[in-house]
A protein has these predicted regions:
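Conserved Lys-Pro-Asp/Glu-containing loop-to-beta segment of HAD-superfamily phosphomonoesterases
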Residues: 114-148
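Short acidic-hydrophobic, aromatic-tinged amphipathic segments that line or gate anion-handling sites
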Residues: 177-186
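Alpha-helix N-cap and loop-to-helix initiation/capping positions
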Residues: 34-41, 74-81, 114-115
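Substrate-recognition element of Asp-dependent hydrolases with the DxDx(T/V) motif
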Residues: 46, 50-83, 95-109, 148
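Conserved hydrophobic residues forming the short capping helix/wall of the S-adenosyl-L-methionine
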Residues: 86-91, 124-127
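Acidic, Mg2+-coordinating phosphoryl-transfer loop and its flanking beta/alpha structural elements
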Residues: 137-178
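Active-site neighborhood of HAD-like aspartate-dependent phosphohydrolases
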Residues: 2-61
């Protein structure tokens, strides 16, 4: 790993925060939502990447804005069913997510919608040993990068050049500490360092 990559990563990495849509599963076109397991298409290499993080002893937490709940497009129970099915798929690969935290609200109605800190605070309440200094935030949008930066967490942009990339991804590339084309490549960098 180059020194320029290594200098951005925490010395004692303990927790990896992951955005969901666009990192773990394929991102839907703007205005469309993952509403069921049938529309949750796992990105290549994701189960194996998460298994590698688990084997390295790292805590893996998903933090996700799920505005579609507030819009009435799906329910919190629908999201839970998706996450249970995803955990089963991960289990088949010797992997797991330690916790899922999601914001079910529309814009400006809460403190938990990324980039606000509420999802991080929920994670710390459940796992008191979490520290921003030993965490990494991996996401595919400017909101994910801003979330991490506001908290002082190292940020990694998954820049897959998807046709469904979030607006502002170019500026997120500039402000992220690091960027990689896939979760697998980001995990490679993390595990070489830790």
């Amino acid at each position: 790993m180059t020194d320029s990559v290594s200098k951005h990563l925490p010395r004692d990495l303990s927790t990896v925060f992951l955005d969901r849509d666009g990192v773990l599963n394929e991102k839907m076109p703007e205005g469309s939502y993952v509403t069921s397991w049938n529309s949750f298409h796992v990105r290549p290499g994701v189960p194996e990447a998460i298994a590698r993080l688990n084997r390295a002893g790292l805590r893996v937490i998903v933090v996700s804005n799920q505005r579609g709940i507030a819009l009435g497009l799906y329910t919190a129970e629908d999201v839970e069913a998706i996450h249970l099915a995803f955990q089963q798929l991960l289990s088949d690969h010797g992997a797991h997510i330690d916790a899922f935290f999601l914001c079910p609200h529309d814009h400006d109605q809460c403190n938990c919608r990324k980039p606000l800190p509420g999802l991080f605070e929920q994670a710390v309440a459940q796992f008191p040993t979490i520290s921003a200094a030993t965490s990494v935030m991996i996401g595919d949008s400017p909101v994910d990068i801003e979330f991490g930066r506001r908290l002082g967490i190292t940020t990694i942009l998954i820049d897959s050049n998807s046709e469904h990339a979030a607006p502002g991804t170019e500026s997120a590339r500039e402000s992220a500490d690091l960027h990689f084309p896939s979760l697998s490549e980001a995990v490679n960098a993390l595990l070489v360092r830790s």
